[in-house]
Amino acid sequence: MTNESAHNTPTVKLACDLIAQPSVTPEDAHCQRMMIERLEAIGFKVENLRFGDVDNFWAIRGESGPILAFAGHTDVVPTGDLGKWATDPFTPTIKDGMLYGRGAADMKGSLAAMITACESFIAAHPNHTGRIAFLITSDEEGPAINGTVKVVEWLEARNEKIKWCLVGEPSSTTLVGDVIKNGRRGSLGAELIVKGVQGHVAYPHLAVNPIHMIAPALAEMASETWDNGNEFFPPTSFQVSNFNSGTGATNVVPGEANVVFNFRFSTELTADILKQRTHAILDKHNVNYDLKWNLSGEPFLTAEGELVAASVAAIKKITGRDTELSTAGGTSDGRFIAPTGAQVLELGPVNATIHQINECVSVDDLNTLSDIYCTMLTELLA
């Protein structure tokens, strides 16, 4: 394929159309309408699902059999300083084989590849086995309260079960398809308020310093071996992301300290075990505290099975390379789908520029990704 023809494929054209919509979370900016029009044209039945201020849709083709669902999001993160962009982030621009624009890699390029893969597959296999579905939201980059999690609840209420789920998050590191995510660590966040007694620094016996109170406990938590990981997951990590205390004055012992921390944890632990061990450390150090927890998602793992095999085979067939299975990185909406029993994988373009100024993706990679998705459909449903 020549450079010029690579730029004019249905995948790249659709990616450009989607990028041109300023769908900063939770706005969809008509991206879903564009996708729905393409899907209805090839026989999908679509149900629009609006929860709160969030647009979602569920589209399905086929009457019976196992469901292969493509999952993704139309919302993007804010652009940041527009003056630092080489091009307008919502004016898709191709330069030196790279497509620039907010959402190019995360994840409008994947959405375009999913649509065109289905168009190609259905043209070749109009009477395919099983069912193909799309679960699309505009609330992945934001609170993720009225998006995928609500659609999953809606599906469960109808007893609609996804067997295989392909999430289009940008999983690749250097070359498209070099890494697929077959699981993710859990994420447990906490907001800790340490209660002291405010006073004058010259009269410490009349004050209780919350910074001094919490410091030994935080040191122990930071040095603690929470687990040793396993063959699929690295060891659980503990990180303090925010620490605030003090009045701004140099002669006042603060009365309170606020600490925000996070665990990224493996399948060796549960959120409840982490909570218990945290409370035990705080209590051992006689910390006076309030603690609020936020579980963003439990860890999940898709072991060897049909979906892993299909993705590995498709990547090998289209690119000639062997892929790496990984559970590294942050959370995704796969965390809401995996607990239903579905096999979940993340496979998308290179993630080197996601959320950055001048976000971009290779146009060749988008075309390759569409071919990989189409081959996976053939492996599972032809």
UniProtKB/Swiss-Prot annotation:
It comes from the Bacteria. One of its GO terms (molecular function) is succinyl-diaminopimelate desuccinylase activity. It is an enzyme of class 3 (hydrolase). GO terms for biological process: diaminopimelate biosynthetic process; L-arginine biosynthetic process; lysine biosynthetic process via diaminopimelate. Zn(2+) 1 binds at H73, D106, E169. It catalyses: N-succinyl-(2S,6S)-2,6-diaminopimelate + H2O = (2S,6S)-2,6-diaminopimelate + succinate. Binds 2 Zn(2+) or Co(2+) ions per subunit. Gene3D superfamilies: Zn peptidases. Zn(2+) 2 binds at D106, E141, H355. InterPro entries: ArgE/DapE_CS, Bact_exopeptidase_dim_dom, DapE_proteobac, Peptidase_M20, Peptidase_M20_dimer, Peptidase_M20A. Keywords: Amino-acid biosynthesis, Cobalt, Diaminopimelate biosynthesis, Hydrolase, Lysine biosynthesis, Metal-binding, Zinc. Pathway: Amino-acid biosynthesis; L-lysine biosynthesis via DAP pathway; LL-2,6-diaminopimelate from (S)-tetrahydrodipicolinate (succinylase route): step 3/3. Disulfide bonds: none annotated. Homodimer. Catalyzes the hydrolysis of N-succinyl-L,L-diaminopimelic acid (SDAP), forming succinate and LL-2,6-diaminopimelate (DAP), an intermediate involved in the bacterial biosynthesis of lysine and meso-diaminopimelic acid, an essential component of bacterial cell walls. This is Succinyl-diaminopimelate desuccinylase. It comes from Saccharophagus degradans (strain 2-40 / ATCC 43961 / DSM 17024).
